[in-house]
Amino acid sequence: MATAAGATYFQRGSLFWFTVITLSFGYYTWVVFWPQSIPYQNLGPLGPFTQYLVDHHHTLLCNGYWLAWLIHVGESLYAIVLCKHKGITSGRAQLLWFLQTFFFGIASLTILIAYKRKRQKQT
């Protein structure tokens, strides 16, 4: 049987990775939906590369964007299954894992995968 602390286990991920993922997904969203508003000339080496992708591979960018979100949905659902498997039974904790994994993907899921619940000693 899981301990009360184990049943409600939740750990926020690294602020560094959450920042990197948020900025990357934000930029990707900008490129896919509003490519005409991007100041390519002000982005250094990233600007011409992004402009090339927008001009020559926009369909691939769009498909990749939706695939990335689909993967995040899959990771989130797996996080719920993993919560149950690891004895995290609190609905609130499961919701937090689901949301964190949905928005930040593998950066969140690796924390949950690494979690090992404490075993109670049998007397």
Swiss-Prot record:
Cite the InterPro entries for this sequence.
TMEM254
Key word Transmembrane helix present: yes
Q: Where are the membrane-spanning stretches?
A: 15-35, 61-81, 95-115
Annotated Pfam families: TMEM254
Point out residues bearing the modification N-acetylalanine. Answer: A2
Q: Which UniProt keywords apply?
A: Acetylation, Membrane, Transmembrane, Transmembrane helix
Indicate where this protein resides in the cell. Answer: Membrane
Task: Give membrane topology per the record.
Answer: Multi-pass membrane protein
> Where this protein primarily resides, as one coarse class?
membrane
Record's GO cellular component, any one? membrane
Q: Does the keyword Transmembrane helix apply?
A: yes
Q: Which N-terminal stretch is annotated as signal sequence?
A: none
Question: Could you identify this protein by its name?
Answer: Transmembrane protein 254
Its source organism is: Homo sapiens
What is the taxonomic lineage of the source species? Eukaryota, Metazoa, Chordata, Craniata, Vertebrata
- Its gene name is TMEM254
